[in-house]
Amino acid sequence: MSEEKSYCGFVAIVGRPNVGKSTLLNKLLGQKISITSRKAQTTRHRIVGIHTEGPYQAIYVDTPGLHMEEKRAINRLMNKAASSSIGDVELVIFVVEGTRWTQDDEMVLNKLRDAKAPVILAVNKVDNVQDKAELLPHLQFLASQMNFLDIVPISAETGTNVDTIAAIVRKHLPEAIHHFPEDYITDRSQRFMASEIIREKLMRFLGAELPYSVTVEIERFVTNERGGYDINGLILVEREGQKKMVIGNKGAKIKTIGIEARKDMQDMFEAPVHLELWVKVKSGWADDERALRSLGYVDDL
């Protein structure tokens, strides 16, 4: 009896900031793994999400959004991470937003024209397009930009046509042995995922108040005698005023962030979590490449 063939390959999800790349990854995996918020630049590392279905294993790389501004060290590193993801994959999903087309979209497209991998164009947030008559001419405009493998209008938020993307991915995976066991959904450590969950809550609850000068270090991540985890998170900001903002009036803001982060961690780790958070000022970290390296921003470039 012949052994069943297996298929496996890397798939990069690329696009300018805030077009819904992380939401799409979470939908493709069937669970939350990459952080999502309405602010641009929420994804700072390349997250590998793994989806195994029978003989097919797709390994998704969720890149930071490519964008024009490279003034700060952190933005330069994020662009480098996104560009390097494009180079070594079997397939690329290029995510754009509705009928919007910007200079940043153009920049991503130019990088993709040089890439060897076939590109699926996912036109996200089509449910938000007010005038549906604009959609068809825009899709025709997109089709003329490059020879895409396929163009799929989707809503990552509601899941519309995400199964179509998944089917195209499966069809184009090369024959290969699986890189990961079938129950793996990410190659990232639980410690890393804990820091991402806290960072998402910071983005969500502080909104536009807080600039991108915030990051999270997990100082302690241990199993306790109750079969759960004790986690200590350190939130780093650049200025004293930002520290007050994170803590909130009588500690209300950081308490909310902690409660919501703990819920998500318990769902993800399937165990009770005791979480403690502190806030510390570390000025200039987003401008300093050495500081970024020490915080793990460059470990995967």
From Swiss-Prot:
Chain spans, region G4: 124-127
Membrane spanning stretches: none
CDD domains associated with the record: Era, KH-II_Era
Sequence positions that bind GTP: 15-22, 62-66, 124-127
Region (G1): 15-22
GO molecular function, one term: GTP binding
GO biological-process terms attached to the record: ribosomal small subunit assembly
Name used for this protein in its record: GTPase Era
Species of provenance: Klebsiella pneumoniae (strain 342)
Taxonomic lineage from the root: Bacteria, Pseudomonadati, Pseudomonadota, Gammaproteobacteria, Enterobacterales
